[in-house]
Structure formats: structure tokens, C-alpha cells
Design a protein with these regions (language model features):
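Aromatic-lined carbohydrate-binding surfaces of glycoside hydrolases
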Residues: 47, 67-168
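Contiguous, structured surface segment used for ligand recognition
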Residues: 1-65
Length: 168
């Protein structure tokens, strides 16, 4: 089974176990959501509920394996709104690993596992070497759309048009 988790008590200890790394992540975020943390807490300013204590019922909780293998979002038409927000928030002209870490967390909290990165003026792999590493460490599969064959986008080509040899 893939991306499956269980939450249970064993000898009075809370155990969250996943069939794989994303399964474990989903189990942790499920418990977080049951404690009142919205998947959107960071993006939509959803307040996190305060609890003086939490309790876990005996038994095993699981949602089972996802019915759809790849689930995610495509950051489309990001300019000017998202690109301006990133510049004002992080001081960069591109989505760096700090920005994508927040996006990846949202995707995982929503039980997604995939993302198609922004492409107008950004180049996911070329802009910040930490982007790819962050996606891998967080368990998010990167994909590309019609505009980015072989995971390379127009910006990478435009920036290096003269530097890739006579076959351009």
C-alpha cells in the first residue's frame, strides 16, 4: 500500500506510522488537523485553535490508501500577483525554497503529493538549487506541463540562449 497511515496507542504511547514517507507525513498532518490546525492556517490566516490538553481514543485510525495516485496543483498565471507577493515577502525575483516549502506543506496537508511549478518568469530548478532538494526532502513529486519539456522551461532557455551551442 502507498501513502497509507495509522494512528494508534501502543502501551499508552501515541504512534503514527506510515507505509512510506508520505504516509507518515499524512498521519502527522491528520492528527494536526484533528487538533484544530487547518491546512490553510499559513495561507488564509486561519487561526490555530488553542488546547490546554488533547486526548486520543483507543483504537486504530486510518484513512486508507488514496484512490488517485498523483494529486497536486499547478501554479499557473503567477504574474503579477504571486510574483509580487514573493518579492515583497522574500525579497527575491523568483520562487525560492522558502516559498516552495510553504507551498509543499499546504499540498501535503491537503493530502496532495505533486506540484507543477510556476513558469512565467521563474525557473524552478535554475533559480534556487535548494528548490529541488526541498521538494525531495518533503516528499513532493515535481512535474511539468506542456510548456516545460524535460523539466526545463522557457526562462532557462531565454537566459542561456547563446550558451548551449550551435544546435540552438
Amino acid at each position: 500500500k502507498r501513502e497509507k497511515f495509522i494512528i494508534t496507542l501502543i502501551d499508552g504511547q501515541l504512534v503514527i506510522a506510515g507505509s512510506d514517507r508520505r504516509g507518515t507525513i499524512y498521519g502527522i498532518y491528520e492528527l494536526s488537523q484533528q487538533m484544530g490546525v487547518s491546512p490553510w492556517y499559513d495561507w488564509a490566516d486561519v487561526p490555530v485553535e488553542h488546547h490546554d490538553s488533547i486526548f486520543v481514543n483507543k483504537g486504530i485510525y486510518t484513512d486508507g490508501e488514496p484512490a488517485v495516485r498523483y494529486r497536486g496543483i499547478f501554479l499557473n498565471d503567477e504574474a503579477p500577483c504571486l510574483t509580487s507577493w514573493v518579492k515583497n515577502t522574500y525579497g527575491t525575483e523568483y520562487g525560492d525554497h522558502r516559498f516552495y516549502q510553504r507551498v509543499f506543506e499546504l499540498i501535503l496537508r491537503l493530502r496532495g503529493n505533486m506540484m507543477w511549478p510556476a513558469m512565467w518568469s521563474w525557473a524552478f530548478y535554475a533559480d534556487d538549487a535548494e528548490n529541488e532538494k526541498t521538494a525531495d526532502e518533503m516528499g513532493v513529486v515535481m512535474s511539468t506541463s506542456h510548456h516545460e519539456p524535460m523539466a526545463r522551461n522557457h526562462q532557462e532557455y531565454a537566459r542561456n540562449r547563446k550558451g548551449w551551442g550551435p544546435w540552438n
